A protein has these predicted regions:
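Active-site Tyr-X1-5-Lys
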Residues: 1-19
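NAD(P)-dependent short-chain dehydrogenase/reductase
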Residues: 13-19, 23-59, 64, 73
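Conserved loop-to-helix N-cap of the C-terminal "lid" that shapes the substrate pocket in Rossmann-like
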Residues: 19, 55-68, 86, 97-98, ...
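Alpha-helical membrane-targeting segments
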Residues: 37-60, 115-150
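Mid/C-terminal beta-alpha module of Rossmann-like enzyme folds, strongest
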Residues: 70-139, 167-195
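Hydrophobic/aromatic residues within transmembrane alpha-helices
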Residues: 156-157
């Protein structure tokens, strides 16, 4: 938030800025995300999906290609925006914290014939390692986002763009898993498992 305040102050001196807030990123190129380093392990077949949230707690996910299309659309309208324009990107709302894991399991089962198991995310392990690793410290600090619902309201974005780019969840998950090297190429999928 401090960075946003500094950016906003800069716009009072002639700079222009567009800020897009979004949920947890996922996508084929998002190699440093909780999706790619927590829910699944990039470069490995998905044997299990880790659930980082408390049961019943909703969470917001942002598919990077959709976020990119949103930013491009906002940039195309920058002349009509205030010098400091802040928007919320709704993305995919996982109302009970299990929807993304269920989508991963369905995609993997369809592509490989094997349904991954679900396990709890090992927050306890992160707390032990956090003092020695900056990224893990940051993750532990953001743990509250997995203990309480935090949902971004995209009405202002919709008022400007008319709609928010939105790839269907399973399509986005499949592209992400392929890009992370967690799924076999379509030709390697078992007979009858491909879409």
């Amino acid at each position: 938030m401090e960075l946003e305040r500094r950016i906003e102050r800069a716009t009072q001196q002639g700079a222009r800025a567009i800020v897009v807030r979004a949920g947890d990123f996922f996508g084929a190129g998002a190699r440093s995300s909780l999706f790619s380093q927590g829910l699944v392990t990039q470069g490995k077949p998905v044997a299990a999906v880790a659930l980082p949230g408390d049961p019943g707690v909703g969470h917001q996910w942002a598919y990077l290609p959709d976020v990119a299309r949103t930013m491009v659309a906002l940039l195309a309208r920058r002349a009509q925006l205030a010098p400091f324009a802040r928007f919320h990107f709704a993305g995919h709302w996982d109302a009970d914290g299990t929807r993304i894991a269920a989508a991963i399991r369905r995609v993997v089962a369809r592509r490989t014939g094997i349904e991954p198991r679900v396990r709890r995310f090992p927050w306890w392990l992160l707390r032990i390692a956090a003092p020695f690793h900056e990224t893990l410290r940051g993750l532990v600090e953001m743990r509250y986002l997995w203990r309480e619902d935090v949902r971004l309201d995209n009405r202002q974005l919709l008022a400007v763009l008319g709609e928010e780019p939105h790839t269907p969840l399973e399509q986005a998950v499949e592209a992400t898993l392929l890009g992370l090297g967690c799924l076999p190429a379509r030709a390697d999928a078992p007979a009858g498992a491909g879409a």
